[in-house]
Amino acid sequence: MPITSAASRLGTTAYQTNPIELRPNWTAEDAKIVIQAVYRQVLGNDYLMQSERLTSLESLLTNGKLSVRDFVRAVAKSELYKTKFLYPHFQTRVIELNFKHLLGRAPYDESEVIEHLDRDQNQGFDADIDSYIDSAEYDTYFGDSIVPYYRDLVTTGVGQRTVGFTRSFRLYRGYANSDRSQLAGSSSRLASDLATNSATAIIAPSGGTQGWSYLPSKQGTAPSRTFGRSSQGSTPRLYRIEVTGISLPRYPKVRRSNKEFIVPYEQLSSTLQQINKLGGKVASITFAQ
């Protein structure tokens, strides 16, 4: 079932249906559906050419020689997967993708990333892949027959954490989006939030709103202004509004450019109205102090 009434706006509607499973007495057509679902999930919805298909593994699954779990394992260990995700990405980004592709969630804390970094360095990539698929977590949610899915985007019951839902939207950028065609490229999406154990803001997926084109400043700050006002108000509490997509002539015609406004609480509402008049999209509102 959907975890939020905003499922259609957040791009999670596709996950309101039951997971794809290879049930007893399955047919060749059922196996074909499972194969396509595994490719979509494990390869991050990246385009797969006919010549790239792992036909020998597909045949083993279709003939009942491989379980769904073992097919997922084989795809994740394949040279195809390594070429798409291991070789071109930073290691922390690879671990984020492994969590997403194999466990259907984002890392919950930095200790999980450190654990997999250590295993990859000391035992190798294949051993690290095994640690996801042979885990009690994988067994509980997917077992031998269910294709992994983004389980933190739907209500699955016990064991879910709110931080997993919000962080999923830094990795999941919409049903039609590919993990190899995102604005942030090969860099980690969650390293900063995990290192500081801070909450992750939800940014709507690609195509849903213009918020998807937002990227935070790499220096952690953005150019500031207050529409000509003083940032001092009657209350000491200030708010930082980070904005993308301002479209007036004096602003650069770059959708990813962002600007920061520091305002007191009393001016928050009027500032938001002015941002709207300027054609901007609010990416985040946080306490400035």
From Swiss-Prot:
Pfam families: CpcD, PBS_linker_poly
Domain PBS-linker residue range list: 2-180
UniProt lineage: Bacteria, Bacillati, Cyanobacteriota, Cyanophyceae, Nostocales
Family: Belongs to the phycobilisome linker protein family.
GO cellular component: phycobilisome; plasma membrane-derived thylakoid membrane
Compartments it resides in: Cellular thylakoid membrane
Record's compositionally biased regions (Polar residues): 216-233
Function of the protein: Rod linker protein, associated with phycocyanin. Linker polypeptides determine the state of aggregation and the location of the disk-shaped phycobiliprotein units within the phycobilisome and modulate their spectroscopic properties in order to mediate a directed and optimal energy transfer.
Residue span, CpcD-like domain: 236-288
Main location: membrane
One annotated GO biological process: photosynthesis
Name listed for the protein in its UniProt record: Phycobilisome 39 kDa linker polypeptide, phycocyanin-associated, rod
Keywords: Antenna complex, Membrane, Photosynthesis, Phycobilisome, Thylakoid
Cited SMART domains: CpcD
Location of the region described as Disordered in the Swiss-Prot/TrEMBL record: 213-233
Membrane topology category: Peripheral membrane protein
Record-linked InterPro entries: CpcD-like_dom, PBS_linker_dom, PBS_linker_sf, Phycobilisome
Statement: the UniProt record of this protein carries the keyword Membrane: yes
